[in-house]
Amino acid sequence: MPSTRFMVFCCVAFAAPAANRLWSATTAEQSIKRVATLRAARAAHTATPLPSGDILLVGGMTESGGSLASVERFDPRDNSIHEVSPLATPREAHTATLLPDGRVVVAGGYNGAYLKSIEVFDPSTNRFRAAGSLVEPRSGQTATLLPDGRILFAGGVGTGWTFLRSAELYDPATGRSEEVGSMSVPRESHTATLLRGGQVLIVGGHRGRRQDMEVYSSAEIFSPQSRRFRPAGTLGTARHKHDAVELADGRVLVIGGADRSDRVYYRTTEIYDPRTGQFERGPSMASARYKIAGTTIVLPDGRVLVTSGAKTAELLDAAQGQFRAVRGGLPAALRFAAVASLRGGDVVITGGYDDANHTSTGVWRFEYR
């Protein structure tokens, strides 16, 4: 990685695969092409769609290991990039959450210190303002907007490289955050997916570093009513640095990731069924990929677009139960890119870094039609 400090969103249905079924990848009609260049190369940043249709790109890490305060807006109407007022505090490995009123809550992260500060972006002024703080500093946490407007922050890494099992609820109306029940284990590089009914599914992740790392196959569910976590089934393969999205039928697709060595990447997927509380094997991708959290998009027609972690993006065709390669692609297997969907179904892929730890200024657009 560029920095050792950061090691630290029609109905879909899948037939349950037979044990000996082979999932193949063919070529989809859609394509990806480069459309713009960022003012600053960045990875471990965030990309958030605004009510105007623009994409807000916040912070991230540089190739030299620094953290960015710079912020850019991508205008999809002409594929242009515009600078906006910077963050008060440079940060990477933070979260950015779009509120119903169009503001964006940027929380936590790292810039040489683990951060607890929160800044809120107002698209009407193009500026950030301070908006309270987390209960404790955290980087690499997950952030999930709940139906009642509060944000659940779970896990991550805190001061002194402490892996966190704690969670907290932040209220944007008051700028205050409060602790809730903790997860069963400390987690970083996990995923958090909002389920129907307002519960949040936490999957996988790890604690520890290098030879002391433990990667989890466990999952748990947070209930806003009880403010506690409970067990929620077990993955067939322990994984971290993966991605997860809710499908149109309410199940959750868990994608890719890696083992504890970070040398074995997965092309496998698993599907969590909230009705049974169990995971089952899903279709496999053509390419193994990891460091992909937040880069998988469910398209308007229910297909699933997996964008980064490999040179070729893939589309999951639900009707045929297979992944299809997307034409065009990326120049490298970008890690920690940031991805957002546009109105009408197009998808924008930004930044990331390659296997040589070079951060990218690239902006690519998947054309949905």
Give the location of each predicted region.
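Bacterial N-terminal signal peptides that target proteins for export
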Residues: 1-8
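Bacterial N-terminal signal peptides
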Residues: 8-17
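Kelch-like beta-propeller repeat domains
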Residues: 19-369
